């Protein structure tokens, strides 16, 4: 136990130092200094760690919350930079692999789809919402092109400039794919009747960064989504909670959802994935989300991960080498 406490203390000290350095940056736009500091931060947070961020003291907790906001701002600058770069090409979708973390989106989207079909059997979505899509809507793109070819995607973001950048990526895209992707400038808190039309809602990790904000978003979704509709929530686990908010499963249950599965990656995919379903009284909703009944899905064995990674890399190359089609 003492060794674990020392490990946690050393990690928190390292991350606090990186937070201090990042806070002093004149800008969070992509640069050698910005890239180096955030690379160091991710490198520190990705390995398995005994840290429980919920048990941090007030000072460390405040540092963590501010760090998540800095990460969000830096991510926004990075995505805007690459969205503008991609938009300069005649067919932007041919060049997606230029984004350094594109492969992570391919892997994360496949993971989410696999969990969805495994734990929500028989689901065949025709209308999907992605809340917090940003200027590079890679997740919707990968899901629409490779996993949900019959679904129409409504992408929501509060930032009009982000949506405009996202639309520009589809210049020259296959008409079938482009016709299935719509972008709306709206805060999820203002959506009501629209939410009842979706079979699946994906909630991005940085929508609602503070715990109470996240709980409020989930409660709003629960109040307006259709009974039986699926909710896929991105979260974090362990030290990765210094990069992204950790979603409390009780907040999901209180929002009116059955929590079906939780997955904590142990590789370069940063986000945990939570699959839930809006409780449906006609199907005995509420039983699957009982305390202790949620399967925490283990990452696959190393050989399986290598095979999956090889397949994802090949898919990423194919995705970037030709125009998307459905």
UniProtKB/Swiss-Prot annotation:
UniProt lineage: Eukaryota, Viridiplantae, Streptophyta, Embryophyta, Tracheophyta
Organism: Oryza sativa subsp. japonica
Any Pfam family hit: NAS
InterPro entries xrefs: Nicotian_synth, SAM-dependent_MTases_sf
Keywords: S-adenosyl-L-methionine, Transferase
Listed name of the protein: Nicotianamine synthase 2
UniProt-listed PROSITE patterns: NAS
The EC number(s) this enzyme carries: 2.5.1.43
Tissue: Expressed in roots.
EC class (word): transferase
Induction notes from the record: By iron deficiency in roots and chlorotic leaves.
S-adenosyl-L-methionine is among the record's keywords: yes
């Amino acid at each position: 136990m003492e060794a674990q406490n020392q490990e946690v203390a050393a990690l928190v000290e390292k991350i606090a130092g990186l937070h201090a350095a990042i806070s002093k940056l004149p800008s969070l736009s992509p640069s050698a200094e910005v890239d180096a500091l955030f690379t160091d931060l991710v490198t520190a947070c990705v390995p398995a760690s005994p840290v429980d961020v919920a048990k941090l003291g007030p000072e460390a907790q405040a540092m963590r919350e501010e760090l998540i906001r800095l990460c969000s701002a830096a991510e926004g600058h990075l995505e805007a930079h690459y969205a503008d770069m991609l938009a300069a090409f005649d067919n932007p979708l041919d060049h997606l692999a230029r984004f350094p973390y594109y492969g992570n989106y391919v892997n994360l989207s496949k993971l989410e789809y696999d969990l969805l079909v495994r734990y929500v059997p028989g689901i065949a979505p025709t209308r999907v919402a992605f809340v917090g899509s940003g200027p590079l809507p890679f997740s919707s793109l990968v899901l629409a092109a490779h996993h949900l070819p019959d679904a129409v995607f409504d992408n929501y973001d509060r930032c009009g400039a982000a949506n405009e950048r996202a639309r520009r990526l589809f210049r020259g895209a296959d008409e079938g794919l482009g016709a299935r992707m719509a972008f709306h400038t709206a805060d999820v808190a203002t959506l009501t009747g629209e939410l009842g039309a979706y079979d699946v809602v994906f909630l991005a990790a940085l929508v609602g960064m503070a715990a109470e904000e996240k709980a409020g978003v989930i409660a709003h979704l629960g109040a307006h989504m259709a009974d039986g509709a699926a909710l896929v929530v991105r979260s974090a686990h362990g030290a990765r909670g210094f990069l992204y908010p950790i979603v409390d499963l009780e907040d999901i249950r209180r929002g009116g959802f059955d929590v079906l599965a939780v997955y904590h990656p142990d590789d370069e995919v940063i986000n945990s994935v939570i699959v839930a379903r809006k409780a449906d009284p006609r199907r005995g909703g509420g039983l699957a989300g009982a305390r202790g009944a949620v399967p925490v899905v283990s990452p696959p064995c190393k050989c399986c991960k290598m095979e999956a990674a090889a397949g994802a890399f090949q898919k990423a190359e194919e995705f970037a080498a030709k125009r998307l089609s459905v």
